[in-house]
C-alpha cells in the first residue's frame, strides 16, 4: 500500500490502524540539533485527542506519545524520529454486527473494491485516528518553523450556517469549539448538542494561517506551494474543499479589485498593501500571511437508520452506534495546523537547494 509518506526533504510516514495495538509516525529529514520537547508534542496531541469535551467522540484515549528514536538530550540527532502512541480504549466489538455492511459516507466500499480485503474495525487505516501521526510529526515541523520565525494558527470559522463574526485569537483555546468568537462559539455548542440528540452530525469550515513565511517558498508548475498545501489538506479525512485568499470569491471580483499593489516598506522589504492572493503568487510564497480555509463534511457515522447494501450487494439497513464525533471541527484545528507545518517545513528545506548564494 503506497501513499503513506508525505514530503520530499522533510518527510513524514504514518502507520497504524484505529483499533490496532498502536499508531505512530516516522519523521525523516529533520536537521540535527533541533530542540524537540516531548512535552510540546504531547501538548499538540492533547489538542487533537478524543474525549476532550462534549462535542467530541466519547472514546477515552490518553494518546501518550513515546519518542523511540532520533532524539537525544532533547535535540534531534538527524536520524529518523520514530514516535508511538498505544491505543488503550479500542472497542472493535462495536463493529462486529456491521462488518459485512457498507457504511454510507465511509470508505468501506472503496477499500473493498481496491484491495478485496479490509480492516472493518472502525475503518482501520482510513480512520481519522491515523492523524495522530500527522499531529506528532507536525509538532516537529512547527519547532523547525519557529526557529525561522514562522507561526501557524487555525480556528473554527463556521459550523453549518453559524459563522464567526469576531476574530479574537485569544479566545480560540478558551472554548471547546476552538472558535475565535465567544458568542458564536456558545451557539455552535448548542447546535452540536442538538445534532447529537437528533442522531445527526454537522460540517463546517476551519481557517488556517501561517505568519512569518519568507518569500520564495514553493516550486513552479507541479510543486506549487498551494498545490502541495492543497494535497496536504485534502489528504485529511472528511475534507471536501480548500480555498486560498479570496478563494471562490474571486469569481465575483474584477482584476482591478483582486490585484494586490506592491509597495516598498519602511524596513526596505517589498510587500503588498492587501492580501487577496492569500500569500502565494505563481505557486511561490510572497512573504505575506498565507491564508486558507478548508471545508469538512459532516461525520458519516450517525445512529440514524440508513439504507445500504452488504458485501454481496443485498439491500439492507444500518444503524451506526458507538463513540463518534458529531462534528470534526474542534479536533480538525490542530490537524490542519500540522499539515500546513509539514508542507512549509519541507519547502523551507527545499529552498536551500534552489539557488547558489554569493
Curated annotation (Swiss-Prot):
This protein's record includes keyword Zinc-finger: no
GO CC, one annotated term: cytosol
Cofactor binding notes: Reduced FMN (FMNH(2)).
Catalyses which reaction(s): 5-O-(1-carboxyvinyl)-3-phosphoshikimate = chorismate + phosphate
Pathway linked to the protein: Metabolic intermediate biosynthesis; chorismate biosynthesis; chorismate from D-erythrose 4-phosphate and phosphoenolpyruvate: step 7/7
Binding-site residues for NADP(+), renumbered to this chain: 48, 54
Cofactor: FMNH2
PROSITE patterns: CHORISMATE_SYNTHASE_1 (PS00787), CHORISMATE_SYNTHASE_2 (PS00788)
EC number: 4.2.3.5
GO process annotations (BP): amino acid biosynthetic process; aromatic amino acid family biosynthetic process; chorismate biosynthetic process
Keyword terms of this UniProt record: Amino-acid biosynthesis, Aromatic amino acid biosynthesis, FAD, Flavoprotein, FMN, Lyase, NADP
Pfam family, one: Chorismate_synt
GO molecular function, one term: FMN binding
HAMAP family per record: Chorismate_synth
Similarity comment: Belongs to the chorismate synthase family.
NCBIfam families linked to this entry: aroC, PRK05382.1
Identification of the protein by name: Chorismate synthase
Amino acid at each position: 500500500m503506497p501513499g503513506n509518506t508525505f514530503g520530499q526533504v522533510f518527510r513524514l510516514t504514518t502507520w497504524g490502524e484505529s483499533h490496532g495495538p498502536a499508531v505512530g509516525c516516522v519523521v525523516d529529514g529533520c536537521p540535527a540539533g533541533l530542540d524537540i520537547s516531548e512535552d510540546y508534542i504531547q501538548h499538540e496531541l492533547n489538542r487533537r485527542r478524543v474525549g476532550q469535551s462534549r462535542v467530541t467522540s466519547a472514546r477515552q484515549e490518553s494518546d501518550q506519545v513515546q519518542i523511540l528514536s532520533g532524539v537525544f538530550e532533547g535535540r534531534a540527532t538527524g536520524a529518523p524520529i520514530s514516535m508511538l502512541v498505544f491505543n488503550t480504549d479500542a472497542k472493535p466489538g462495536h463493529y462486529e454486527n456491521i462488518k459485512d455492511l457498507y457504511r454510507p459516507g465511509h470508505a468501506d466500499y472503496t477499500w473493498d473494491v481496491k484491495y478485496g480485503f479490509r480492516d472493518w474495525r472502525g475503518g482501520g487505516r482510513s480512520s481519522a485516528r491515523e492523524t495522530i501521526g500527522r499531529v506528532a510529526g507536525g509538532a516537529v515541523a512547527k519547532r523547525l518553523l519557529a526557529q525561522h520565525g514562522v507561526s501557524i494558527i487555525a480556528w473554527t470559522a463556521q459550523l453549518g450556517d453559524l459563522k464567526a463574526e469576531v476574530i479574537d485569537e485569544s479566545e480560540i483555546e478558551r472554548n471547546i469549539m476552538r472558535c475565535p468568537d465567544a458568542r458564536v462559539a456558545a451557539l455552535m455548542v448548542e447546535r452540536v448538542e442538538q445534532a447529537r440528540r437528533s442522531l445527526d452530525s454537522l460540517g463546517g469550515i476551519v481557517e488556517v494561517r501561517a505568519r512569518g513565511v519568507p518569500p520564495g517558498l514553493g516550486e513552479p508548475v507541479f510543486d506549487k506551494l498551494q498545490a502541495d498545501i492543497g494535497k496536504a489538506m485534502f489528504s485529511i479525512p472528511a475534507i471536501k474543499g480548500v480555498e486560498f485568499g479570496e478563494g471562490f470569491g474571486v469569481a465575483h471580483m474584477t482584476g482591478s479589485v483582486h490585484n494586490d499593489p506592491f509597495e516598498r516598506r519602511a524596513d526596505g522589504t517589498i510587500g503588498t498593501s492587501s492580501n487577496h492572493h492569500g500569500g502565494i503568487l505563481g505557486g511561490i510564497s510572497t512573504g505575506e500571511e498565507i491564508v486558507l480555509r478548508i471545508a469538512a463534511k459532516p461525520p458519516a457515522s450517525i445512529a440514524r437508520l440508513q439504507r445500504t447494501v452488504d458485501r454481496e450487494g443485498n439491500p439492507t439497513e444500518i444503524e451506526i452506534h458507538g463513540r463518534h464525533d458529531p462534528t470534526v471541527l474542534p479536533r480538525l484545528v490542530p490537524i490542519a495546523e500540522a499539515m500546513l507545518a509539514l508542507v512549509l517545513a519541507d519547502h523551507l528545506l527545499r529552498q536551500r537547494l534552489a539557488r547558489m548564494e554569493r
